[in-house]
């Protein structure tokens, strides 16, 4: 593999010295870029784009051609694992992801098949290898998965949900069934992320998008417990380098101490968490990633720069900060505003590293 030319992102995750704060954006390869829309149209549909290694590589690299980002993130979807388990993933126009065979019973959980990530999800591994080759060592590549709890929300609800009534009914009425499902999913995520690491991912992230809908007690039992299992099962070194792992629970700002105790390297913060407070609480244990409100990218470049400064000052001097949005970039953000954001982080952060 090529020698890494810019390792700021990996160094920051390990709380090692950097010259400026590294920055990338969740969903940086996406619909706000006209070139992404053109490539997606060429692919035909979203999953065809994910399953074509060359096109997945192309959309992964598109934001890097526009902006001096410090990391690339694999272009894929969090629902690849349930799709590999035979739930029949499809996308309804305007509705988002759906499953034709959702989980409704203990019998459904019992019959979920094991899978080989190099077979059923070989297209993801091909994309990882292709992207690593084409990056030529410019920046590191991030691999990712959904968390067991978040995957379960889609698998039991049959798609997106606002109230999660089917899953919460299972959680309270049949907790043993849900634990069995989550345990199978945790094992699958470990296999999947380790396969991504072996294929070339230099850092991995677990997205717990829906952990924030739980009570604190339920979060620990049904989400965090299984993310802890994943952290324990991951390859933490490859190619002679540490492979950092980041956990991100949207709405999880009240549980940072418990998240940091899993042994992960970094925590993602959404925009509702004060980064200064987060650093006071867990900055001696983990790096922090975040956490500008994605909607700030609708503002003027000047206002974006002010917000960047506020967050940099909130984190303060020293190491262990990866700048990002608090969630994914919105599809109708002007690309030039994303560029202003990236440039502001690099231009304004050097003084915090001297």
From Swiss-Prot:
Pfam families: URO-D. This is Uroporphyrinogen decarboxylase. It comes from the Bacteria. It catalyses: uroporphyrinogen III + 4 H(+) = coproporphyrinogen III + 4 CO2. NCBIfam families: hemE. Homodimer. Substrate binds at residues 27-31, 77, 154, 209, 327. GO terms for cellular component: cytosol. It is found in: Cytoplasm. Keywords: Cytoplasm, Decarboxylase, Lyase, Porphyrin biosynthesis. The gene is hemE. The keyword Thylakoid does not apply. Pathway: Porphyrin-containing compound metabolism; protoporphyrin-IX biosynthesis; coproporphyrinogen-III from 5-aminolevulinate: step 4/4.
């Amino acid at each position: 593999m090529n020698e890494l030319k810019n390792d700021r992102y990996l160094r920051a995750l390990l709380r090692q010295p950097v010259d400026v704060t590294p920055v990338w954006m969740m969903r940086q390869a996406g619909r706000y870029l006209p070139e992404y829309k053109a490539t997606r149209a060429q692919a035909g549909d979203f999953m065809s784009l994910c399953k074509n290694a060359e096109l997945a590589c192309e959309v992964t690299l598109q934001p890097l051609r526009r902006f001096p980002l410090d990391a690339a993130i694999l272009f894929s979807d969090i629902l690849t694992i349930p799709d590999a388990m035979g739930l029949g993933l499809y996308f309804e126009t305007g509705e988002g992801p759906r499953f034709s065979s959702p989980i409704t019973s203990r019998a459904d959980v019992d019959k979920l098949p094991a899978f080989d990530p190099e077979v059923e999800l070989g297209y993801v591994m091909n994309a990882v290898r292709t992207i690593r080759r084409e990056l030529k060592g410019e920046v590191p590549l991030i691999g990712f998965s959904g968390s067991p709890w978040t995957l379960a929300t889609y698998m039991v609800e049959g798609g997106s949900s606002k109230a999660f009534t089917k899953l919460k009914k299972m959680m309270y009425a049949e907790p043993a069934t849900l634990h069995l499902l989550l345990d199978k999913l945790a094992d699958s995520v470990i296999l999947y992320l380790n396969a991504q690491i072996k294929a070339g991912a230099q850092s991995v992230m677990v997205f717990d998008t829906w952990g924030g809908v739980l009570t604190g007690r339920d979060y620990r039992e049904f989400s965090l417990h299984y993310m802890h299992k994943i952290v324990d099962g991951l390859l933490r070194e490859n190619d002679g380098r540490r492979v950092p792992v980041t956990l991100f629970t949207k709405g999880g700002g009240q549980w940072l101490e418990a998240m940091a105790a899993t042994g992960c390297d970094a925590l993602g913060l959404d925009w509702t968490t004060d980064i200064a407070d987060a650093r006071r609480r867990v900055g001696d244990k983990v790096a922090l990633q975040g956490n500008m409100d994605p909607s700030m990218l609708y503002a003027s470049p000047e206002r974006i720069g002010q917000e960047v400064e506020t967050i940099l000052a909130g984190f303060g001097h020293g190491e262990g900060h990866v700048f990002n949005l608090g969630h994914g970039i919105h599809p109708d953000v002007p690309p030039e505003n994303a560029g202003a954001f990236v440039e502001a982080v690099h231009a304004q952060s050097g003084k915090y590293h001297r």
